Regions:
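Sensory modules in modular signal-transduction proteins
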Residues: 5-37, 152
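PAS-family sensory/regulatory domains
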Residues: 53-64
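Terminal output helix/cap of sensory domains in signal transduction proteins
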Residues: 63-95, 143, 149
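PAS/PAS-like sensory domain cap-loop motif
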Residues: 41-52
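Sensory-domain boundary/capping and coupling elements
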Residues: 2-5, 9, 127-145
Length: 152
């Protein structure tokens, strides 16, 4: 696409209409401050952009800040590396959702780290199904063990 205006408009429409939550954040000290969120992010979290812009994105973690995935994200951001992980987040109404979060550092034309681009996908259904499968497999293993002990 040769027309830069057309390309910019297409990219804007792509981000605004994406099904996944997309955010842009900038690093300020130990904080990662949201400077843009798309409509899908607002739908996913229940927060409007007016409520959350220029805040650190940790508000989605609620009180549950001891998750291993949070350490993974923080380390990647501190090292300016891309990362993808799943973490537990909370919507504005307090309900839990499992968030597959991808964070990618963005460098400007002089190779300065300027922003982080985050993409959020609600994977609650997948996590719930995996937990149910793991539980069923544990029960099967326990039953197999009990059957083996009865055979002796």
């Amino acid at each position: 696409m040769k027309d830069p205006k057309l390309r910019t408009n297409l990219l804007l429409q792509l981000v605004e209409n994406a099904q996944e939550g997309i955010v842009v954040a900038e690093k300020e000290g130990h904080d990662t401050i949201l400077i843009y969120v798309n409509p899908a992010f607002e739908r996913l979290t229940g927060y409007s952009s007016e409520e959350i812009l220029y805040q650190d994105c940790r508000f989605l973690q609620g009180e549950d800040t001891k998750q291993e995935s949070i350490k993974i994200i923080r380390n990647a951001i501190d090292d300016s590396n891309p990362v993808r992980t799943i973490l537990k987040n909370y919507r504005k109404d307090g309900s839990i959702f499992w968030n597959e979060l991808s964070v990618t550092p963005y460098y400007d034309e002089v190779d300065q780290l300027t922003y982080y681009i985050g993409i959020q996908k609600d994977v609650t259904e997948e996590v719930t199904l995996q937990e149910a499968l793991d539980s069923a497999n544990q029960k099967i293993a326990q039953l197999e063990s009990e059957i083996q002990s009865l055979k002796k």
